[in-house]
Structures are given as C-alpha cells and as structure tokens.
C-alpha cells in the first residue's frame, strides 16, 4: 500500500511540467471551436478486450457513416488488455499518450462547456444500428504481420489451406474477483465431443484464452490447447480470431475480435438470454437452460436467519423476499424448465449478476455435451454449404426487443437458434404437465 502511494505521488510529480502544455492545448481547442472546428477527446476502455475491440469497431463504423463529426483524439485508460489491438488501432486513429491526454481532459472539464470537447465514453459494443454490415473491418494486419502469422501456423502443424475453429469457453479463472459474473462460467470438458468432431472433419481447433482454470485434455493432433500449452501470444490471439473458419464461444470479451473481422459465431451456453447478439449473420446460438424451483409450502420457522421452505422432495431457504435454494437438497422434480415468456416475464433474460438468479429462485443449467455437439455440427455444415438455417420467423417475432439504458439492444435479426435445440426446447414445454400459461402459449405457437 505504501509503495502504491509513493508511486502515485511520483507520477503526479512527473506530470507537473506538462500542466502548461496541456492548458495550451485546451486553449487552442476552445479557440478552434469558435471558428467551427470541433476537437474532441475520449478514453479507450482498455482494460477489457471486449470493449477495446467491440466498442471502437462500432464507433469507427459510425464515423465512416457520418455519425461522428470533428477531429477525435483518443487515449488509453488503465491497463491495456491487448498490445496488438492497441497497435492496430493506432494505425487508423489519433491516439495520444495517456499521461498527457488525461491532463488535457481534466483541465478542459474545469471550464463550462467542456462537454463539447468530449466524444463521450462509447460503452456500446452492440450493433442495433446495423453498422457492421455496412462497413469494412478497421483492424488490418500489415504484410509483415501476415507473414508472421502464417509462419506460426506452420510451426503449429497447419499446412496451406488448412482451416481452424477458435474455441473460447469462459471459466472461473476469468476475472476471478468479479464473482457476480460466475453464472457465465462453463466446463470446457463438455466441449470435447464437439472439438473431436471438428478435428475429424479436418479442422484444427484452438482453445483460446490468456488465463484459464484447467487444461483441455483432448488428445488429437489437430486440437491445440493454445490457452495452456505455452504457445499463446498476444499477436496470435488476434490473428487466429481474425482468420478462423468460425468461432465457438460461451460469450466473452474476446469474441469481439472475430466479430470485428466479421467471422461467423457459434454461441453456446449464452446468458443473459435477451442480450443475444442478434445482428450477427451466418451465426448460431443456444442458451443455458433456465430452471425455476416450485415451492409448494413454507414452514413458518426461522432457521439461520431465513425461513425454512419445502418443495415436494427437498428444501431451500426463504431469505427476505427471495428464495435461496440448496441444490444438494433438491431433486430434478423440484425444477421446471422456463419458457421464453417465463424468462422474459421474470426479468431473468436481463439479469447481469449471479445473485439476481438466486433471488428469483432460478437455476441455470449448462448445455449438455450432446447439445453443444449438435449446434457445432450444424454450424460446420452451414459454413461448408451443406445446410442453411430457416428463418425461424415465429420465434424471432416473439423474441423480446429489450433496451438497456434507453439504448435498443436489437436491430435487424440475423443470428439463428440451433435447429435441434429450438425444436427440442419447444417439445420439452409441450410435454410439461404443469399447465402453466407459458407452456400453453408455447404449445400454441409451435403446433
């Protein structure tokens, strides 16, 4: 702690000589504004690769389409999650050193009207305006970088014309201090069958990630545990995502790389449900199963600070206005699959923290290895031109058009649900004997 304070003081002291130049820049910027020349500043959200790539690619597309005017100057804020991405952005944007630009931004904020000189934090990595399909990718490799990538692929055993699939499975090693996102974690072992299927079809499979909880123990010469075998590099983490045949993911920030290069995506175990990246073409999605506990009676007795509650064959705890359920004391009969309408009505489709699901008495169940294999096989067939997804019109007409912070989450819908997953989810609800309104509505829609 003491070292940190000394370091911060030293940084502030070193910046003192820059105060006058920064103030002169602010003065110049304000004077230019009087003559109709707009100069604006903003920070990259550098610490998260999803925002460093996704937000900025959307911004640059908007700029190309005339949605942003003026001279824009950017700087990094915080630790840079990918030096390769930072280097590539510098080729197409004005990026100033953070130690100086931060002072410019702070001094500018000391005077009225500072908002005119700020781009504002672009926190949207979604594409409801459909800008990605109207613009070319802005991340571009140099000739030397392409040669470097090809040479590395050769070292890894890939020959000319070989295709590969990126596999990105979020686990507990990703942002371990932010446990409220743990509901998004999955077990990479459940992807073994899908990886082997792809390898047998001739694809190389690269398990991606910079820091992962455990190795991907699947033995095949075309399956590479890039995240754990010591071959990972910041550069290849971008290169592989840029040129993959498609990417299989559970939805992480790294996905922004293949998305920015307009690569097809196959999402599995996706949550939150209403945040599905609907704008992606040539892509498929299946989501985690949402299960609702059905409590039939509650005992009016306080137990360890909560009311003891019983289901037909197990028990949980009522704490305040929500139910904390103990999985080891509940059986499968205590859980009921939720329909799309029930997910939407409960608010679970927009839940962003694990505790939200706990409060609502909802448990998320991962996709099975069979479900993952099925949708990845369908994706490979689609990429190879062996099949094409249908429009799924009825489903997408009912899909909730949610908004977040007054911004729409969806525009034109291009992604499709895995065909077998969609069919079986509906069949599952039709066989549900609970008689719920959601089940009846779903049965009517799929009759």
Walk through the language-model features, giving the residues of each.
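A donor-sugar binding/catalytic signature common to diverse glycosyltransferases
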Residues: 237-284
């Amino acid at each position: 702690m003491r070292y940190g304070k000394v370091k911060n003081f030293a940084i502030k002291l070193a910046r003192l000589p820059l105060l006058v130049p920064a103030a002169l820049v602010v003065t110049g910027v304000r004077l230019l504004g009087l003559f109709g020349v707009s100069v604006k500043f903003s920070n990259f959200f550098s610490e998260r690769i999803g925002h460093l790539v996704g937000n900025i690619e959307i911004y640059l597309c908007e700029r190309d389409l005339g949605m942003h005017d003026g001279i824009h100057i950017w700087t990094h804020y915080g630790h840079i999650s990918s030096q390769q991405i930072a280097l590539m952005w510098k080729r197409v944007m004005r990026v100033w050193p953070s130690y100086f630009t931060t002072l410019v931004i702070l001094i500018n904020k000391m005077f009225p009207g500072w908002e005119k000189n700020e781009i504002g934090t672009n926190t949207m990595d979604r594409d409801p305006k459909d800008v990605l399909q109207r613009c070319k990718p802005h991340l571009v490799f140099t000739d030397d970088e392409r040669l470097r990538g090809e040479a590395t692929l050769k070292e890894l055993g890939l020959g000319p014309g070989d295709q590969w699939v990126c596999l990105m499975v979020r686990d507990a090693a990703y942002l371990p201090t932010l446990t409220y996102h743990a509901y998004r974690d999955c077990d990479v072992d459940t992807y073994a069958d899908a990886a082997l299927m792809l390898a047998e079809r001739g694809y190389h499979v690269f398990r991606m990630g910079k820091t992962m909880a455990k190795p991907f123990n699947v033995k095949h010469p075309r399956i590479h545990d890039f995240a754990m075998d010591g071959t990972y590099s910041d550069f290849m983490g971008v290169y592989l995502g840029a040129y993959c045949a498609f990417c299989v993911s559970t939805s992480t920030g790294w996905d922004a790389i293949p998305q920015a290069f307009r690569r097809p995506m196959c999402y599995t175990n996706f949550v939150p449900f209403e945040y599905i990246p609907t704008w992606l073409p040539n892509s498929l999605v299946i989501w985690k199963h949402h299960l609702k506990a059905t409590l039939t009676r509650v005992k009016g007795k306080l137990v360890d600070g909560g009311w003891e509650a019983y289901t037909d064959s197990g028990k949980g705890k009522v704490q305040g206005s929500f139910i904390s359920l103990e999985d080891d004391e509940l059986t499968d009969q205590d859980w009921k699959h939720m329909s799309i309408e029930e997910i939407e009505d409960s608010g679970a489709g927009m839940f962003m923290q694990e505790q939200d699901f706990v409060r609502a008495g909802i448990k998320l169940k991962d996709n099975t290895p069979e479900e993952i294999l099925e949708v990845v096989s369908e994706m490979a067939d689609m990429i190879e031109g062996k099949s094409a997804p249908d429009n799924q019109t009825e489903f997408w007409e009912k899909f909730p058009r949610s908004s977040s912070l007054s911004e729409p989450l969806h525009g034109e819908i291009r992604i499709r649900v895995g065909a077998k997953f969609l069919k079986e989810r509906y069949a599952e609800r039709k066989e549900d004997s609970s008689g719920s309104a959601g089940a009846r509505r779903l049965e009517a829609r799929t009759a």
